[in-house]
Amino acid sequence: MAKFLVLWHLDQGLLSTEMARAVQHMPEYGEKLQGQKKVTDRYHLVGGHGGCWIYDVDSNEELEMLLAQAPVFNFAHYDVRPLADMTAMPLSE
């Protein structure tokens, strides 16, 4: 399993009725992924239009597929960061 921090924000230049509908479907999409244990945490970014989600996936390809299925995929910019579990790292001597 690999964990990724995914920050996404909406491109306000693409504001439309279609974008508004996509945003309305994000909570349902997030709940579905949390139920499947593919998303461990979801946060709203205060003062902006977007979110911060932590994905726990089997591969880069699975992450790409889940991002592409997000309702806001065509309206958002993504910043994807791989995460490392610092407690799993060996201590240097």
Located regions from the model:
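Conserved, structured core segments of small domains
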Residues: 1-93
